[in-house]
Amino acid sequence: MVLSQRQRDELNRAIADYLRSNGYEEAYSVFKKEAELDMNEELDKKYAGLLEKKWTSVIRLQKKVMELESKLNEAKEEFTSGGPLGQKRDPKEWIPRPPEKYALSGHRSPVTRVIFHPVFSVMVSASEDATIKVWDYETGDFERTLKGHTDSIQDIPFDHSGKLLASCSADMTIKLWDFQGFECIRTMHGHDHNVSSVAIMPNGDHIVSASRDKTIKMWEVQTGYCVKTFTGHREWVRMVRPNQDGTLIASCSNDQTVRVWVVATKECKAELREHEHVVECISWAPESSYSSISEATGSETKKSGKPGPFLLSGSRDKTIKMWDVSTGMCLMTLVGHDNWVRGVLFHSGGKFILSCADDKTLRVWDYKNKRCMKTLNAHEHFVTSLDFHKTAPYVVTGSVDQTVKVWECR
């Protein structure tokens, strides 16, 4: 590469400045003489430290080039494997793609839970700021705030119709909200500590809650009365989720176990213990994924001829585990997150698993091959929650960075 006379002159002056400022006096005077440099104070200021600056900026640019090259390779790969640019993927295989469609700000403390409405194009977020916010995920517009709790809200579920929203809080209460009038219609007291999780049973008549008081309680929606208490966990119960038909509920705890309970008898049907730290989250596999799971894990079809049910769990041991509840066996362990796993669920197509964690990422797993197939650097801080829309191609995440992000899938 040939330098112009001006560039050569600038380079020589920068070299001279470098030699002099680093104490190479002899080399400086020889170089100055040979390069026929006329150094004066004004010029000296202009070239002070220039060589080092150029050197570091070259390194920075090289790093940027490498980053862009890897993004380009990723895009090429997506193109050849039929990404959004290549032939159209089957919607069952659509996964979230960066960058996010919307980053929504409004909460004044970490976001603890995000969920989609089952019918309308809205989603709801809960936060440590004791509020629930409603957003339109198609336009990114903020719609309203629901206030009533006096401490951090830990969990929010809708019933299947979307007319009823439940919430639970560190203020030890559970609230039911009429999602048409946006009013709190009932407050339930009964737990002796932080209520960390709540879920509405599929029939809509009862709700279940889990607490730091080590119990799980079942409540009647109509009256607000506690009708059952499930005891057995030895520590804080982090999450509770009913299965599709409401005959079983699963729970996970700081005691490092996942338990499955028979609702009718309150008996603990299975205690799943292989995690090595607090189990933060659980999720039931939808029946649409049963055949893929059986194929991927070679799990035996039982005498009844029906596989499953299957359950996912995510833990502070940084792993995700898949369980066959009927046998109590751990079918697989997915390793890849670099910090506590905070949310896990099945892709609505049944072939993939999505998870979020304190390593600030959202990950998509191809469980058939037990590998992480996509990692999205989702937030500036821990990712606390995620939800996948049942019918529309959207994923939503919430974070300690106080934002809610909407990701489009394709």
Curated annotation (Swiss-Prot):
CDD domains tied to this protein: WD40
Entry keyword Lipid metabolism: yes
InterPro entries linked to this entry: Coatomer_complex_subunit, Dynein_regulator_LIS1, G-protein_beta_WD-40_rep, LIS1_N, LisH, PAC1-like_LisH-like_dom, WD40/YVTN_repeat-like_dom_sf, WD40_repeat_CS
Region (Interaction with DCX): 367-409
Superkingdom assignment: Eukaryota
Region (Interaction with NDE1), start-end ranges: 1-66
PROSITE patterns: LISH (PS50896), WD_REPEATS_1 (PS00678), WD_REPEATS_2 (PS50082), WD_REPEATS_REGION (PS50294)
Annotated family: Belongs to the WD repeat LIS1/nudF family.
PANTHER family in the cross-refs: COATOMER
Name the record gives this protein: Platelet-activating factor acetylhydrolase IB subunit alpha
Source organism (scientific name): Pongo abelii (Sumatran orangutan)
